Amino acid sequence: GLDSSSLPAYYGLAEGAWQHWARVWDVDYEWLKGRFDQTEYHDGLPMNSSGITVSRWVDGVLEEDEAISQRTALKAMFYWGHAVNSQTRGPEMRRAMQKLEMMVIVDPYPTVAAVMHDRTDGVYLLPACTQFETTGSVTATNRSLQWRDKVIEPLFESKPDHEIMYLLAEKFGFAEELTRHIQVNGKEPLIEDILREINRGTWTIGYTGQSPERLKEHQKHWHTFSFEDLRAEGGPADGDYYGLPWPCWGTPEFAHPGSPNLYDPSVPVKEGGMGFRARFGIERNGVNLLAEGSAPVAGELDDGYPEFTDQMLKDLGWWDDLTDEEKAAAEGENWKTDLSGGIQRVAIEHGCAPYGNAKARAVVWTFPDQVPKHREPLYTTRRDLVEQFPTWDDFRSLFRLPTLYRSIQENDNSDRYPIILTSGRLVEYEGGGEETRSMSWLAELQQEMFVEVNPADANDIGIRDGDTVWVEGAEGGRVRVKALVTPRVGRGVAFMPFHFGGIFQGENLHDRYPEGAAPYVLGEAANTATTYGYDPVTLMQETKCTICRIERA
């Protein structure tokens, strides 16, 4: 998945995290453990080590078994709402698709994954509902949740995601464990119960107070919320911030209003304020990591303090503020594992943030670079900067896979590939573009894939605006696109948008789409020409800086 280093809500992958979620899901921890390979690999036990990231699935397929920190290379892939053309290294991706034993695409649209593989079998398309054909909660980037209603019944044979998941769980034999506290109507789990289960477990981020009932109340009374600060003025949700942006501490019954702005100590915790989390201990190398002389207003502790635990409540004399039921649940627990929410409730009643009050961490001692520093890209036209700003050494295993840095950067490709290539977004399209390029009004606005080239470079190459050109990346991937000659890019730099797909290295794949399902606009995927490179902390792919050559087609 996108964050393969943690269970939901940043609990991590240690045994305690699995035990927490086993309690939330009401399944036996040993049963969960028994579903994992118990072999110790370079990265450790698979259950407790980060998985292969979505950015590296290609290498998860193509690497030899003995090079991977798990039993075998990947044999099957689910592309669930995933745009493969938004990932780098297109030619290697096609090879990986061909090596897989099975591909499953779950999406309202066939997507590029359904047509670029060049396979004749082992590919399954599962039509998923759009947002208009299902109901439930969604979370926006400001951390607010919204409840949405179904507009129309699912078209054709499409199904909502949670029903598809349930049907898969049935086939795999763990549907009962998946839905132990979730009502299932026919084959469709009740979406409200799914959110309630999320609320029951995600204490770390305060995704616990946003019950379906509270979100529906917000939905019905949109008009009572301010467009300026999101807060309701009167009405049933008086004082709440719209969508109860997380952290919305405690249980729904505690009625925390949500936190519209993170790390604001000028507001009481009970009203959405907080300091920085005491996430990294209380001291390091003799330096106090807790806040000094700073705390959220109206709190009974006016200095730094660690994360709240049952023992901390006892030491402060606040333990008896818990109900008897809360005491039974909180004994031996902390603010993020107490399923009653009592520890959070009592801390907040005393004006304290449950996660503690610490200093912001500027020196990240767990990262390869403890403070940000420039490292020259693996592929660069500035070879003079490589010695001054070298990349990292290769990693034997990172997120289960060998990850290359220095061994790539040591090779000088700049004579053959003299132009820096970057990629990015357009206003008209989103992501891999499958949905937006299938909308006639948007498709009319951007009908062709292109590369932006500086006028000086165009003159040096011998091309004009509107010419068809080949853009070849430093690993040999090529795209056939129109040249847009413009000073918007600097001399020696080219730009391509990444929203296009359906043409692969000059080959039009239109006929491979199911009848009537091809987008209005097809084009080369920019990432066919992009190259290897991954951030060592997150394994995020390098899409912004590689090198290329451009020539007339």
Model-derived segments and spans:
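Short Asp/Glu-rich motifs
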Residues: 115-116, 138, 176, 188
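Short conserved micro-motifs at the rims of enzyme active sites and ligand-binding pockets
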Residues: 89-90, 116, 136-139, 156-157, ...
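Long, contiguous, secondary-structure-rich segments that constitute the structural scaffold
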Residues: 163-212, 300, 310-314, 319-328, ...
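Short capping/connector residues at structural and topological boundaries
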Residues: 137, 143, 150-152, 157, ...
